[in-house]
Amino acid sequence: MAPLGGVPGLVLLFSGKRKSGKDFVTEALQSRLGADVCAILRLSGPLKEQYAQEHGLDFQRLMDASTYKEAYRSDMIRWGEEKRQADPGFFCRKIVEGVCQPVWLVSDTRRVSDIQWFQEAYGAVTQTVRVVATEESRQQRGWVFTPGVDDAESECGLDNFRTFDWVIENHGDEQHLEEQLEHLIEFIRSRL
C-alpha cells in the first residue's frame, strides 16, 4: 500500500558521500527525462525545514551549499537521528506526499532504514543507486573531511550496504559518466 503520494512506476534511491555528485546526477537525469515524468525528492528537505522551524533558522539557506548550512550540519544530523529513532519513516513519508510523476529520484538516501521504508512501501519498483567518486574528485569539488559529519551515520550508514542495483562512477570523466547515465535512462524508459 503506497502512502499519501501517487503510485510510482519506478523509485530510484541515490546514495553517496558528500560531493560525490548525487545532486548533479539526479538533476541530469531529470533534465533528460523531463520534470513531468521525473521528480527529485530530497529527504534532507523536510528535515531541514522542520529543523529551521524549531530553531528559528533560515530554511532556504539550509538548503543550499553554503557555510550557513555547514555551521549547523552537526547539530542538524544529531537532531535528525533523534527524529528517525522515534519514527524511522518520518522523513520518507513527508517527501512522497502529493508526488504524481511516475519516476521518483530520491537524491539523498543515507540509511538502511530509508531503503527499507521505500522497499516496504513500493516493493519491486524500488532500485538503489550508489554514486561514487574518488577522494581526489570530491576534494576538487570542495570536500574537506569534517569530524562528526563525514564519520557520522548520515555519511557512513550505507558504506556496508549489500549490493546496490546500480553504481554510477563520477570521478570526473565526463564521457564515462555520460555512458552510465544513458544506460540508466534506457532502463528508466523501459519501466514507463
Curated annotation (Swiss-Prot):
The keyword ATP-binding applies. Pathway: Isoprenoid biosynthesis; isopentenyl diphosphate biosynthesis via mevalonate pathway; isopentenyl diphosphate from (R)-mevalonate: step 2/3. Pfam families: P-mevalo_kinase. SUPFAM superfamilies: P-loop containing nucleoside triphosphate hydrolases (SSF52540). It is found in: Cytoplasm, Cytosol. GO terms for cellular component: cytosol. ATP binds at K17, R18, K19, S20, G21, K22, D23, R141, H171, Q180. One of its GO terms (biological process) is isopentenyl diphosphate biosynthetic process, mevalonate pathway. Catalyzes the reversible ATP-dependent phosphorylation of mevalonate 5-phosphate to produce mevalonate diphosphate and ADP, a key step in the mevalonic acid mediated biosynthesis of isopentenyl diphosphate and other polyisoprenoid metabolites. This is Phosphomevalonate kinase. It comes from Bos taurus.
